[in-house]
Amino acid sequence: MDSFLACSNLTVRFYEQPNPVLHQVSLSIQKGEKVLILGPSGSGKSTLISVLAGIIPEHMEAEVQGEVMRQRHTGVMFQDPDSQFCMHRVNEEIAFSLENRSVPREQMDDMIQHLMKKVQLDVDPNTDIHTLSGGMKQRLALACLLALEPDVLFFDEPTAQLDPAGRMEIFQLLQQLSAEQNQTMIFVEHVLDGVIEWMDRVILLDHQGRIIADGTPKDVMNTFEGEMKEAGIWRPKIFPEKWSTIVQDSFHPLSQTLLQTFEARKERHETSTNREVIIRTDHLQLSYGKKSIIDDLHLDIKAGDWVAIIGENGSGKSTFLKHVIRLEPIKKGHIFLKGKHLKKWSDRTLYEKAGFVFQNPELQFIQDTVFDEIAFGGRQRNWPESVVQEKTNQLLAEFGLEKHRDVHPFTLSLGQKRRLSVATMLLFDQDVLILDEPTFGQDEKTARELIRRLKERQRQGTTIIMVTHDMELVDECADQVLVFHQGEHVYDGSPFDLFSHQELVTSCELIVPLHYRYMAERKEVMTIAK
């Protein structure tokens, strides 16, 4: 069978880096295949699809050796949707894609509405793109991609910024499209559940950008589990097992593991009551631009707690963080930090007390090298250079960035950029550390190391406030969970109580950690058996 996409002995090196990011890669993909590319952070996954899509070297400079066979009409959905938008409004952005297909203007409005409905982008077509949440931007990017009707669709973590329910909806949509149109699709993904089940092949890269496995999902998962764990690659929680089998068989190894995890969470279940309040909101209105999201928000955050803020895309989670750090102006209501009104803190003192890690790491980079980016804050505070050097080198080592110390932050992979953004904040000993999607784009090993570092910082008394879509992370780390849903603050309490509250979980469309789902469905099985 003739190849639809292929490369032979492909080696790619970016000019500012001494070593290739991809090394002697050879593969062949047939028309209609669904292929998942896996590998640790920085292994060249995004580079590989950029070469196959024709972005490298046509639009991005790099030294490319080997042979590549591409299709003429390709579409790519990137990790960061902002990087591919060129218009101001939602309908204009989709229309731009349709214009590239020479669609008559009089047909566009109906097609735009159809595409928005297909990706569940439920906003006014005239909405300014910059006012959309990260997840809504991902949906818009997908609509633009589908408008092009390309021969091959490339997806670089297409649901990374979506809430769990939205993530499953998009993957179900893509699975439906692939079945209806025999569409060739190439994916790069960190979180495998919901996508690996319908892939034809899995290609596994190592840290050096070499292919170490290429086969069916089941074969690769079973044969290379040790290599994947060592490389820090997330594994699916259920696949290749069947969920129905796990629930029905209480002696199944996964059943035993889920029961033990549930009991451990139950024992850990407690609320902190004796700590002082470090952040308090009073009649606060969450608003972004002219849009009001939540009115009259009252909540307390206690010193030393790990607080998780969850909810659907557009519910105000990131906006709340920006209000707390004064990046978004407060139009109504009040925020108090350590009993003092937020308006009364000077910028310098506020940022010495609270650090903020953006959802998009590039927004906080201001230096030309990774080393200088981490060192910048200490130098601004006139630390002795010996102290700056010592602390910076320590953080480079702990976050696996030593070999990138002299490169520009913008040339890092998304996972490496995220590690750098957190490392710059951990240079200091702030009272409050605020993180927007801290594990976004991380492989399992680096995510675990990051969480270990944050837990250590919490043990030293730092208050951690994070926005996340990772419910396992919430369950493992959070002392307090805040749920924002459809313009309301609907929950304030422990993870255990939240995930055990079936009615609330259902109404908020939360996808709970598997051990809670297992216990709920196991009760149903036992009830039917009786």
Feature map (PLM): residue ranges:
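ABC ATPase nucleotide-binding domains
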Residues: 228-279, 501, 505-530
